[in-house]
Swiss-Prot record:
Protein name listed in UniProt: Putative S-adenosyl-L-methionine-dependent methyltransferase Mvan_1345
Function: Exhibits S-adenosyl-L-methionine-dependent methyltransferase activity.
Positions of S-adenosyl-L-methionine binding: 134, 163-164
Protein family per UniProt: Belongs to the UPF0677 family.
Enzyme Commission number: 2.1.1.-
Species in which this protein is naturally found: Mycolicibacterium vanbaalenii (strain DSM 7251 / JCM 13017 / BCRC 16820 / KCTC 9966 / NRRL B-24157 / PYR-1) (Mycobacterium vanbaalenii)
Lineage, highest ranks first: Bacteria, Bacillati, Actinomycetota, Actinomycetes, Mycobacteriales
Pfam families reported for this sequence: LCM
Gene Ontology MF terms: methyltransferase activity
Amino acid sequence: MARTEGDTWDLGSSVGATATSVAANRAFASRSTAGGPEPLLNDPYADLLVEAVGLPHFIRVARGEIDFDDDPLFGARQMLEQITVRTRHFDDFFAGAMAAGPPKIRQAVILASGLDTRAYRLPWPAGTVVYEIDQPTVIEFKTAVLADAGVAPTAERRTVGIDLREDWPAALRGAGFDPTRPTAWIAEGLLIYLPPDAQDRLLDHITALSAPGSRLATEHMDAKALTGEWARAMTERARRHGSDVNLSELFYSGPRTSATEHLRAQGWQTEVLSSNDAYQAQGFAPVADHLVAMIGDSGYLTARLD
């Protein structure tokens, strides 16, 4: 179903299903060594959450029961490498942000947190508060599943159940967020699901809430990746393997100001890590040529507000 203004979802539909898909991929990478001595990732809770959502396709992905090896677009190796690079990149961002300073950063915000498990699995410094923002039903589901399994956060976790199209800055402050203290923000896999004007507003809100020393990590999207071709190709791939998630209906394609340019105009110091450099930083070969042709210079954006 195509996106509409004010639409809602759960973890089995629309944008919510993409959160389940990402968690399934993390679970798959957490049980795959790809020929090495250790699993590619260590997310002990992704599988638990995917099983609780209960969608058969994503359960099979998480268990490694689907053969992606011969897919012409994105085989199992590329799939495992992509989720490994992405997850490690944002994990490393938080680790680096917490180690930086002065001033020390001791509050983190995960926007559109979905089935993100970082508040439960990263070794946060003492005194860190992690805020998770997402739709109320998504927040409630994850909280309940992990609590029922006896899993406790590794930092003080505060949840903010609100749609990012609503007044989430007020809700965040109401949960105890202190805009006078530096913050580490991540918007992982989020911007492509926002209309161009909503992306700009989100970045403006982040800027308004960020004290000097704050840091932000998100994706950098090349214009080539916003034409809709990438979404169509990934939708066709999903259907080949039994999923009915239609990314063509979920992405907002077309012209937009890049997050990098927008943040620079707001006074942030920005750095873009290309996909190839991100892969090589994690010990993988460069991205396949046919994928580069579709995603262009897309990669990872980090920013610092001095």
